[in-house]
Amino acid sequence: MKYVPEKGCYHGAFPPLYGFDPEDREGSTDQCAVALFEKLVGKQLSMILWYQNMEPGRNFSEMQTVREKYWGKNYQGKYRFFLYGWLPVITTQQMANGELDDFHKSYFAEVAAQKVRDMGPIWFRPANEMNGSWTPYYGDPTNYVKAWRRMYNIAEQLGVTAYNVFVWSPNSVSMPGTEANAMKNYYPGD
């Protein structure tokens, strides 16, 4: 299934409250400052990016709470998509060796159960910017590809991939800019 807009593009953002100057917050204490961002740009968002660490103890219901709060309709009268920036706190070798398998199984089982509510697909963005030296999972393309495929296979076995979207999202520039760390080396395949 493809999620291509009928016309134009999806207007999305990562709108954390800390991105606004204190004088522009209008008294808001909402960590996901969707209303402030929409007021700033003059239109409703089609997609919201929010982050969560990929680690035991974190679960889908935590993200689902954010999703439900901001599920409103966008400017085209359709419900907003949610892009989950999923950040591992371990190395790609640890992920490739299966250290997150139980976490993924539990998480994706929750995701599959939520499909019944039909809030639309979730866009998963796991281990993004893997070609940047600021992440704990950079610098090991071989294990990154193994880890991605391992995670995706678990999602596939639990029926999550047929309805949801998985987004591979490297940084625009590889750092360090070596051939061994080139963006193309991290691509897990179609």
Question: How should these model regions be labeled?
Answer:
Residues 22-41, 59-69, 103-109, 178-188:
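Short, acidic/polar
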Residues 1-47, 156-159:
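N-terminal module-boundary/linker segments of secreted carbohydrate-active enzymes
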Residues 164, 168-190:
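Flexible, glycine-rich surface segments
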Residues 43-55, 84, 88, 182-190:
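Aromatic- and acid-rich polysaccharide-binding/catalytic face
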Residues 51-173:
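Substrate-binding cleft of extracellular glycoside hydrolase catalytic domains
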Residues 5-6, 45, 139, 161-163, ...:
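Alpha-helical structural elements
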